[in-house]
């Protein structure tokens, strides 16, 4: 049977050779039938201490490595780039100012 693989974002890298990965999934509410985001955190083994906070990683199920670690980092899909986030925030702010300048919202 193949091992489970999940994709998530590193939320903590403070431990040696261990990262905490948050994995989001959509679950349908049993009564209201609306899809709701659910987040679960997994402790994963990072042998070379390569992962940093904000990285998107793929983790794979493995044998128990400690009391809480049952996953290992397979690969880093995308590195976190703070410059890209700042650029996106600036673009959004410019769009808001452009809309407000055209009389969209009056203060």
From Swiss-Prot:
SUPFAM superfamilies: Nucleic acid-binding proteins. It holds the Pfam family Ribosomal_S17. One of the primary rRNA binding proteins, it binds specifically to the 5'-end of 16S ribosomal RNA. Keywords: Ribonucleoprotein, Ribosomal protein, RNA-binding, rRNA-binding. Coiled coil: none annotated. GO terms for molecular function: rRNA binding; structural constituent of ribosome. Belongs to the universal ribosomal protein uS17 family. It comes from the Bacteria. This is Small ribosomal subunit protein uS17. The keyword Ribosomal protein applies. One of its GO terms (biological process) is translation. GO terms for cellular component: cytosolic small ribosomal subunit. Part of the 30S ribosomal subunit. PANTHER family: 40S RIBOSOMAL PROTEIN S11 FAMILY MEMBER, SMALL RIBOSOMAL SUBUNIT PROTEIN US17M. It comes from Thermotoga petrophila (strain ATCC BAA-488 / DSM 13995 / JCM 10881 / RKU-1).
């Amino acid at each position: 049977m193949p091992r489970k693989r999940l994709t998530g974002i590193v939320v903590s890298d403070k431990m040696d050779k261990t990262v905490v990965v948050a994995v989001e999934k959509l679950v349908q509410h049993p009564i209201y039938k609306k899809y709701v985001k659910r987040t679960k955190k997994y402790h994963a083994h990072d042998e070379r201490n390569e992962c940093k906070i904000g990285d998107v990683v793929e983790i794979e199920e493995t044998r128990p490595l400690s009391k809480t670690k049952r996953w290992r980092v397979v690969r880093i899909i995308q590195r976190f780039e703070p410059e890209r986030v700042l650029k996106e925030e600036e673009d959004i702010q410019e769009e808001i100012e452009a809309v407000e300048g055209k009389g969209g919202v009056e203060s």
